[in-house]
Amino acid sequence: MAIKKRSATVVPGASGAAAAVKNPQASKTSFWGELPQHVMSGISRMVPTLIMGGVILAFSQLIAYSWLKIPAEIGIMDALNSGKFSGFDLSLLKFAWLSQSFGGVLFGFAIPMFAAFVANSIGGKLAFPAGFIGGLMSTQPTQLLNFDPSTMQWATSSPVPSTFIGALIISIVAGYLVKWMNQKIQLPDFLLAFKTTFLLPILSAIFVMLAMYYVITPFGGWINGGIRTVLTAAGEKGALMYAMGIAAATAIDLGGPINKAAGFVAFSFTTDHVLPVTARSIAIVIPPIGLGLATIIDRRLTGKRLFNAQLYPQGKTAMFLAFMGISEGAIPFALESPITAIPSYMVGAIVGSTAAVWLGAVQWFPESAIWAWPLVTNLGVYMAGIALGAVITALMVVFLRLMMFRKGKLLIDSL
C-alpha cells in the first residue's frame, strides 16, 4: 500500500521564493524548545561580566577591610575622608575605591548584557539594542510621573526595579518583535540601510519604553517589592525561609538558568541591604565539595567503589573548583546519575546553608568561596555550614548509590 504524503501549504517567502509553512504544533514545540537556548545564550555572555565585576570588587574589599583593617561599618569613602591614612596606605585605599566603583559598574551591566544577548539570539543583531535598553531599564527604571492634587504639582518618584524578571520578559518579547518586524516590513533595496539603522531601532526602542513603563516595571517591581515586604516582616523566620529557597534554587542546576535567577534575586537584596547573600554563597560550594568527598569515602564506608572510574579524578577537580566558587565541577555526577546526585546535593545545600544562617554567619559581599571568606562575619560558623552540607551530600549519595547497586539498578565501571 502506498503511503500518501500530505503536501505542505506554500506561501511566497520574503525573497519571493516559495516557502513551506510548518505545522502550527511543530512551531509551538519549536518555540518552547528553543527558548532555553536563547536564555542560556544570554547567561553565557553575562557570566564573564559578573566574574570580572566580582573579582575586582573582591580586591577592593580585601584591600580595605582585610589589609588596611577598616571597620566593617565604615565605607571606603568615609575612610578616605577620615585623615587616618597617608603614604602607601592612602594609595592602596584610593585603589580600593577605584576598584569598588569600577566593579560596581560592571555588576550593573550584567543584566543589560543578559537581556541584549537573549534578544540577539532570538532576533539577530537588530534586536541587540532593544534587549540592552530593556535590560538597562529593568535595573534603572524610568521615573514615574505623578500628579499631587494637594499641591497641584507634577512630581516624579522612583519605581521598584523589575531586575531579572523584567529583563527576561522584555528580552524575549523584544527579540521576537524585532524578528517579526524584520520579516514583515519589506522595503526596496535602496531603503535597506534606512530600515536597519533607523526604522527598526526606533520602533523597537519606543516599544521597549512603553512596555517597560506601563507593564513590565510595575509587574516586576510589584513581585520584587512583595517578596521584600514579606521576608522583612517575617523577621528571623523569613530569613531562614529565604535561605532555604535561595540555597535550593542555587544548587538545583549547578550554574544553570535557575541558579543565575537566584543569584540576581540574592544580589539585589544584598545590594539594597535587605538580606545577606550568605545562603547562596554556601550553596554554590557544597555540591562539588560533597560529591568530591563521596569519591574519597565510598570505599572506606562500604568496602567497594561506587562510582565509575572517570568520576574519581573529576571528584578531586570538583572540590578544587569549589574553592574558586565554581559549582559546575559537580555536573558530571548529576549527568551520570541524577537520581542519586541531585537529591543529595540539594539536601546538603539546604541544610548547610540554613544552619549557617541560623547560627549567625553573615556575608554581605556578593561573591563566593575564597574571594569572600575573609569578609564573612562568624567565619567559623560559615565554614561549619559548608562542612555539614558537604558531609550530608557525601553520605547521602554514597548510601543511595549503594542501595541502587545492591538492587542491580546501578552499573559501575570501577577502577
Curated annotation (Swiss-Prot):
This is Fructose-like permease IIC component 1. It holds the Pfam family PTS_EIIC. Residues 68-101, 148-157, 219-237, 298-318, 363-378 are periplasmic. The chain crosses the membrane at residues 47-67, 102-122, 127-147, 158-178, 198-218, 238-258, 277-297, 319-339, 342-362, 379-399. Keywords: Cell inner membrane, Cell membrane, Membrane, Phosphoprotein, Phosphotransferase system, Sugar transport, Transferase, Transmembrane, Transmembrane helix, Transport. It is found in: Cell inner membrane. Signal peptide: none annotated.
